UniProtKB/Swiss-Prot annotation:
Biological process terms in GO annotation: UMP salvage; uracil salvage
Gene3D superfamilies (alphabetical): 3.40.50.2020
Activity regulation, per record: Allosterically activated by GTP.
EC numbers, comma separated: 2.4.2.9
Protein name: Uracil phosphoribosyltransferase
Residue positions binding uracil: 193, 198-200
Reactions listed under catalytic activity: UMP + diphosphate = 5-phospho-alpha-D-ribose 1-diphosphate + uracil
Keyword Membrane: no
Binding site for 5-phospho-alpha-D-ribose 1-diphosphate: 78, 103, 130-138, 199
Record pathway: Pyrimidine metabolism; UMP biosynthesis via salvage pathway; UMP from uracil: step 1/1
Protein species of origin: Brucella canis (strain ATCC 23365 / NCTC 10854 / RM-666)
Family: Belongs to the UPRTase family.
Alphabetical UniProt keywords: Allosteric enzyme, Glycosyltransferase, GTP-binding, Magnesium, Nucleotide-binding, Transferase
Length: 208
């Protein structure tokens, strides 16, 4: 399905401020919510529309509305919740799935500790959100789980991606399109994206 890099000037400006090491936790949270609104606009750009009959204060008309499968936003905990908040502001009727994964710092492999998703996920477009696509291990594991539950129409949204992660992800799930604000240089020896922005979860919540 490929990779879409969202190059909108506002996205790039806000991402630069988020990258700065002196950006406070409060500012990081605010910027993450703002950028999630802009990224949500892009990842939902080609949703299908139909028309419905309405009446304006002046006259009846046929007006465009969303058609087809309803949305699920699937957040990879914990950092995914930062993107989720802004997206739900735009699409408050979307259902939500939570996928609890943490990365073993020695093996870099994901360990699942929680999974909760709507029962009718097979009938919905699922947009998986996680700020970082680094090794891609967590993203691959999350989408493996969603497919096990019947999801067939999936997109993945992140702030930053590493070339290594994109390569692994697209090989594992070639049917899932990736949307990101930036493809950075590489992964370091600890599996972090560089130049990156640090650990998104720690910067969101002020933890180490």
């Amino acid at each position: 399905m490929g990779v879409t890099v969202v190059s909108h000037p506002l996205v790039q400006h806000k991402l630069t401020i988020m990258r700065k090491k002196e950006t406070s936790t409060a500012s990081f949270q605010r910027l993450l919510k703002e950028i999630s609104l802009l990224l949500c606009y892009e990842v939902t750009r080609n949703l299908e529309l139909t028309t419905m009959s309405i009446e304006t204060p002046l006259m009846p008309m046929e007006a465009p509305v969303l058609e087809g499968k309803k949305l699920v936003f699937a957040s990879i905990l914990r950092a995914g919740n930062g993107l989720l908040e802004g997206m739900l502001d735009l699409v408050p009727a979307a259902r939500v799935a939570h996928i609890g994964l943490y990365r073993d710092h020695d093996t870099l492999q994901p360990i699942e500790y929680y999974f909760k998703a709507p029962e009718d996920i097979v009938n919905r477009l699922v947009i998986v959100v996680d700020p970082m696509l680094a090794t891609a291990n967590s993203a691959i594991a999350a989408i493996d789980k969603l497919k096990e539950r019947g999801a067939t129409n999936i997109r993945f949204l992140c702030l930053l991606a590493a070339p290594e992660g994109i390569e692994r992800f697209t090989k594992a799930h070639p049917d899932v399109e990736v949307f990101t604000a930036s493809i950075d240089e590489r992964l370091d020896e600890k599996g972090y994206i560089v130049p990156g922005l640090g650990d998104a979860g720690d910067r969101m919540y002020g933890t180490k």
